[in-house]
Regions:
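Residues within the DNA-recognition helix of helix-turn-helix
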Residues: 62-65
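Short amphipathic alpha helix immediately N-terminal
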Residues: 29-41
Length: 123
């Protein structure tokens, strides 16, 4: 019996969709199609298998390989994480400015500039 939490499945699908926005171009067309059907259209493995003309096991294997590729790309490059940190920093800076906390806004802006200038991954 499958003991996975449905919330974990939803969280994983959301994370994979997020990573596809950054690294989807690194997947094959078939991997991208299967991931889109699974994560964004919420189709079951059986439904995807029928639509794609492959076995359920084939869909499972393709999803596993595609997900692993996305996670590996993010582990190596960190583009999605960096984008998220920038976005949150910008929102915090904007909020500080709106509330006239100028010293805090300046500190946040300096942190954003430092983040922008990071070159940890050779980008």
């Amino acid at each position: 019996m499958d003991e996975r939490n449905p919330r974990d499945d939803v969280a994983r699908k959301v994370e994979l969709s997020w990573l596809m926005a950054f690294y989807g171009g690194m997947l094959t067309d078939k991997q991208r199609e299967v991931l889109t059907l699974h994560c964004e259209e919420d189709l079951s493995l059986g439904e995807i298998a029928q639509e794609a003309g492959v076995s359920r096991q084939g869909v499972h294997d393709m999803l596993s390989r595609a997900a692993q590729k996305l996670f590996d790309m993010e582990a190596r490059l960190g583009v999605a994480d960096r984008f998220s940190r920038m976005q949150h920093g910008l929102e915090a800076c904007r909020d500080a400015l709106r509330q006239k906390r100028y010293d805090e806004a300046e500190q946040l802006l300096n942190q954003l500039i430092a983040l922008d200038q990071e070159d940890d991954h050779g980008l």
